[in-house]
Amino acid sequence: MSKKLHIKTWGCQMNEYDSSKMADLLDEYQGYTLTEEAEEADVLLLNTCSIREKAQEKVFHQLGRWKTLKDKNPNLIIGVGGCVASQEGKAIKDRAQCVDLIFGPQTLHRLPEMIEQIQQGGKAVIDVSFPEIEKFDRLPEPRAEGPSAFVSIMEGCSKYCSFCVVPYTRGEEVSRPVDDVILEIAQLAEQGVREVNLLGQNVNAYRGATHDDDICTFAELLRYVAAIDGIDRIRFTTSHPIEFTQDIIDVYEDTPELVSFLHLPVQSGSDLILTQMKRGHMAIEYKSIIRRLRKARPDIQISSDFIVGFPGESKQDFADTMKLIEDVQFDHSFSFIYSARPGTPASDLPDDVSLDEKKERLAILQDRITQQAMRYSRQMLGTVQRILVEGPSVKNPMELRGRTENNRVVNFEADPKHIGSFVDVEIVDVFTNSLRGKFIRGEDEMDLRRDLRPSDILAKHKKDDDLGVTQFIP
């Protein structure tokens, strides 16, 4: 009987990416297959996130439920990974004796050895170190799971915003070598991937080493990826305003594969609050970036992150945030009520905005952005949009579901043969969370660009390197 693995994931897209790599790793090296049912599993892994309030308590509640499974099956292995594990490693083990292994985001590649150690009767393992980019060197080849894929290009963040735990849980910024990134994307393209989403806590800080000891910037990486045949859409998340430089904006002007949609977190529209947050920029500088982006790509749509009720946020500070939202006309947001994260500088500030006031401000902000998003959706009525078809519609499996460049879900009727490819549809109806389309044409009637075949890239990858180093030489 095959060994079963169950992974529960909380948090950002980077965590989703990490969880997929854990599954690939344990499948390749130890033969574990994924199961949706925790009761069936031989190994349970919890990939945690420390961004939201009471993250630690959420972890212990989940571990309490899993403990009942371990009481029935003493051989069950329970592991905790992610940012809460990195931050609270020993405390987790002290409080939850059922946990066998604790690992951080940078040590997930060591999971096979950790599990083997436990199976051989070893003590509980705690490894939350920061071995820089080592984890990427030991992961198996990527496996496509549809036409869209996430590819991590860097880890960590060195900005140290006063409210954020990421530098403490994922370490400082470390970029993957550009050869490794291009090779992974080429492998995915060979498997039918058409869209890549480049991941990192701060992707525009990317500075990847090249084969000749030079440095590849994020703007250069975007152009390399755009040249790969079959990759017709590029997204990235997340970026920071202070490193959104002109060379990146220039890519929007001449690289159509880069989508007309950008998630650029601002957090607040108040200069006072931005200073308290240690964001490193003012509201006018953020708006300057947006103006230059819209000059390069007039139809680009912007989403952002907002924190309401940050310590010291006055009614005027919140009004400044609402003014920024109106000026920029954001299309979407991830917005949260402020709650202190242990160990961050902001946790020492007096939390002087009442919970009721925070809730009211959040509701006002979200309502405004929802109105703006609906206005953008209505403007799409009657237009023809290029859709990447992801699979059957969630609500009606007889229909197909795809995504526009500006990240809207479109449901429409068409032949299932179009799954995994691009189609053009006319937008005929608008709903709060989706659009309805009418099929116009398939990919065989489009003139899609062909530059550099993935097989050409893979052919340049010398698999028998004596040093065990992989290289892609453009």
From Swiss-Prot:
Q: Which EC number(s) does UniProt give?
A: 2.8.4.3
- Main location (coarse class): cytoplasm
Q: Which Pfam families match?
A: Radical_SAM, TRAM, UPF0004
Domain (TRAM) ranges: 378-441
Cite the Radical SAM core domain residue spans from the record: 143-375
A GO CC annotation recorded here is:
cytosol
Enumerate the residues binding [4Fe-4S] cluster 1: 12, 49, 83
Q: Which domain of life is it from?
A: Bacteria
GO terms assigned for molecular function: 4 iron, 4 sulfur cluster binding; metal ion binding; N6-isopentenyladenosine methylthiotransferase activity
| Compartment list | Cytoplasm
Please state every residue range assigned to the domain named MTTase N-terminal: 3-120
Coiled coil (UniProt feature): none
Broadest EC class?
Answer: transferase
What is the protein named? Answer: tRNA-2-methylthio-N(6)-dimethylallyladenosine synthase
Q: Which organism is it from?
A: Shewanella loihica (strain ATCC BAA-1088 / PV-4)
